[in-house]
Design a protein with these regions (language model features):
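Terminal, non-catalytic domain-edge segments
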Residues: 4-121
Length: 121
């Protein structure tokens, strides 16, 4: 979810009910979890497969070294000016923090009055 959130912040098109402060706080927490320790990097300094540390069993057959750098897309907001609300808004609890603390939170979903089905056969 980091890459789409970062892109939406960069495009200044965050969904209603999702603030810049929430997105920045969530992205920052994930980045700290991933990058504060050195267990996500091999002896050559390259990223390894895993959320936290080396977890090669989570790889799919199509995973390759380039796949490991998709998290870098979460840095897209670095292209926003320092005065942008993404940087200047106060940090706020994000959806999972609200959910697990018992606070009210908006459901993340798409609603459509039109029901579409698709035959698979």
């Amino acid at each position: 979810a980091m890459q789409p959130l970062a892109l939406m912040a960069w495009y200044e098109q965050l969904p209603a009910g999702l603030s810049n402060g929430q997105v920045r706080a969530a992205l920052t927490a994930v980045m700290h979890r991933m990058f504060d320790g050195q267990e996500n990097f091999n002896e050559g300094g390259f990223l390894t497969i895993g959320f936290v540390g080396r977890q090669p069993n989570i790889a799919d057959w199509y995973t390759n070294n380039g796949s490991l750098y998709l998290p870098s897309l979460a840095f897209l907001p670095l292209g926003l000016p320092a005065t942008h609300p993404f940087w200047s808004d106060a940090p706020q609890p994000w959806t999972s923090q609200k959910a697990w603390s018992g606070a009210p939170f908006p459901k993340d979903h798409h609603w459509s009055d039109e029901i579409r089905t698709r035959d698979l056969f």
